């Protein structure tokens, strides 16, 4: 199947949205590196015009260290010619009709040429503004679907979602599709059009009240979180992504749909080289804060499984699934791409590995001194965490407030600063709580069948499209690949 995957990409024209996002970049690099005879890659990215799109592609995609293997293989001049021939950055936006592509000639050309549509575009903020989440994560996929239906040669729409659309349930969480109007708590029926109307009505009220942009933004965030929790989802991100899946399933007609649901995506495992990453994602924020000596206590169940998966494994699963399902009219298949079912790692294990790493390899302050870390305190319930915060911070804060009241001429900046930090910490804990106290295991039966199909057909090239989590040695990966990658590419040290 590996050779079949490479052959599948031969002479294909592929539209990829969500560029220059982390996963989209890795997916694009993979295709260009393994199949130089791909016909064309249309890359949709937000930009004012063609020139801006090209500039953004070069600065935010091609110039990244991710592409160094391709650069070394081709050389600067050949790479430039190769990219000019194969890659077309397109200014656009999935939240509008026809993906915001301007020019009837260009649109017609794309509809005539595109074989595969890959939608990676999303807003991933857990507490995103509800208007933004709905336009990008919910109705964005519907716009991509409508665009894909106009593609004369269209063989497949591959949509990247997230495994956490399954909510906060415990036990084995299956790779099942959503039905239109389904909720996670079953209390009431979800009507997506009603959600859109509620959002628009609230926005209109806020504007009529002459609210500031900051007030509008916060109100939209609060609305998204409240609507999500009303229907059983922990946050706006997974709620709006779930509704996006519902729309795809309901309006797909005969177009083959593949939904890839990754878990927490981490740095590259092996391709194009180990350890490349961009930005702090979920657990990485905790690891970096710990390494900087800022994390003395954290809310987490030590025995909770954190489902991590390297980004190159997700990209490999995407290519393999596309090769398997292209042209299979009417099919809709969900794939969980994660590790909790086949090779789980717990929060306590990650904590211990991070402690071991930073003890042996401490980060260095600007003055050259080493940051010494000690094992932090892990509290497994919100009640324990709130009690700790009260003793450690809130009571001293009340003392500062009392001083401020008694002596109003005293500089109260310290009180305000600590108060702001505590509120921020509690908000972050509330956002991350569903993930660090997670009790579910993501079933990957469909994904395992995909792996077996690939392995049976072409054993000698099995490693080229690796996405088997059993191949990961977590201790080796975390201490020699992932954490060093965070330090190199995120902290830039």
UniProtKB/Swiss-Prot annotation:
Organism for this UniProt entry: Arabidopsis thaliana
Expression across tissues is: Expressed in the endodermal cell layer surrounding the central vasculature in roots. Expressed in the hilum region of seeds. Expressed in stamen filaments and receptacle of siliques.
Q: What induces it?
A: Induced by wounding and salt stress.
> From which domain of life does this come?
Eukaryota
Cystines in this chain: none
Oxidoreductase as UniProt keyword: yes
Catalytic activity field: a long-chain fatty acyl-CoA + 2 NADPH + 2 H(+) = a long-chain primary fatty alcohol + 2 NADP(+) + CoA
Which keywords accompany this UniProt record? Answer: Lipid biosynthesis, Lipid metabolism, NADP, Oxidoreductase
The enzyme's E.C. designation? 1.2.1.84
| Keyword DNA repair set for record | no
What protein am I looking at? Probable fatty acyl-CoA reductase 4
Looking up CDD domains in the UniProt record yields: FAR-N_SDR_e, FAR_C
Q: What class of enzyme is it?
A: oxidoreductase
Q: Name one GO biological process term.
A: response to wounding
Q: Tell me one GO molecular function of this protein.
A: alcohol-forming long-chain fatty acyl-CoA reductase activity
Question: Entry's InterPro entries?
Answer: FAR, FAR_C, Far_NAD-bd, NAD(P)-bd_dom_sf
Question: What task does this protein carry out?
Answer: Catalyzes the reduction of fatty acyl-CoA to fatty alcohols. Catalyzes specifically the formation of C18:0 and C20:0 fatty alcohols. Provides the fatty alcohols required for synthesis of suberin in roots, seed coat and wound-induced leaf tissue. Provides the fatty alcohols required for synthesis of alkyl hydroxycinnamates in root waxes.
């Amino acid at each position: 199947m590996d050779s079949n995957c490479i052959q599948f990409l031969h002479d294909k024209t592929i539209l990829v949205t969500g560029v220059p996002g982390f996963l989209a970049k890795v997916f694009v690099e993979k295709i260009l590196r393994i199949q130089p005879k791909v016909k064309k890659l249309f890359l949709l990215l937000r930009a004012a015009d063609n020139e801006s799109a090209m500039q953004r592609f070069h600065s935010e995609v091609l110039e990244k260290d991710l592409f160094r293997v391709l650069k070394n293989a081709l050389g600067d001049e050949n790479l430039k010619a190769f990219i000019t021939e194969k890659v077309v950055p397109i200014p656009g936006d999935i939240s509008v009709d026809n993906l915001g592509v301007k020019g009837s000639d260009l649109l017609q050309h794309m509809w005539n040429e595109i074989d595969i549509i890959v939608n990676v575009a999303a807003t991933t903020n857990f507490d995103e503004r509800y208007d933004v989440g709905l336009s990008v994560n919910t109705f964005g996929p519907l716009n991509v679907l409508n665009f894909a239906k106009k593609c004369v040669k269209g063989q497949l729409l591959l949509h990247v979602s997230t495994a956490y659309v399954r909510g906060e349930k415990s036990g084995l969480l299956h790779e099942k599709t959503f039905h239109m109007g389904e909720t996670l708590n079953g209390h009431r029926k979800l009507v997506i059009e009603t959600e859109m109307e509620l959002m628009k009505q609230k926005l209109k009220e806020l504007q009529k009240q002459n609210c500031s942009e900051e007030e509008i933004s916060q109100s939209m965030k609060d609305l998204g979180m409240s609507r999500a929790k009303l229907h059983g989802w922990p946050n706006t991100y997974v709620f709006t992504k779930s509704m996006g899946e519902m729309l795809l399933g309901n309006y797909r007609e005969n177009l083959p749909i593949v939904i890839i649901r990754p878990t927490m995506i981490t740095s590259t495992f092996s391709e194009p080289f180990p350890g490349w990453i961009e930005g702090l994602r979920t657990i990485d924020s905790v690891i970096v804060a710990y390494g900087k000596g800022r994390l003395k206590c954290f809310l987490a169940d030590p025995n909770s499984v954190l489902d991590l998966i390297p980004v190159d494994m997700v990209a490999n699963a995407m290519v393999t699934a596309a090769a398997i399902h292209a042209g299979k009219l009417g099919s809709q298949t969900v794939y969980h791409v994660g590790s909790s079912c086949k090779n789980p790692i717990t929060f306590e294990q990650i904590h211990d590995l991070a402690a071991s790493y930073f003890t042996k390899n401490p980060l260095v302050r600007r003055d050259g001194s080493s940051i010494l870390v000690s094992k932090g305190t892990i509290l497994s319930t919100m009640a324990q965490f709130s009690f700790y915060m009260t003793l450690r911070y809130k009571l001293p804060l009340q003392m500062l407030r009392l001083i401020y009241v008694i002596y109003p001429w005293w500089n109260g900046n310290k009180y305000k600063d600590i108060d702001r930090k505590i509120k921020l910490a509690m908000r972050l804990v509330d956002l991350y709580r569903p993930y660090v106290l997670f009790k579910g295991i993501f079933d990957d039966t469909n994904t395992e069948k995909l792996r077996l199909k690939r392995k049976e057909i072409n054993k000698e090239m099995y490693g080229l499209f690796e996405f088997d989590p059993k191949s990961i040695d977590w201790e080796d990966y975390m201490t020699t690949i992932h954490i060093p990658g965070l330090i190199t590419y995120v902290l830039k040290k």
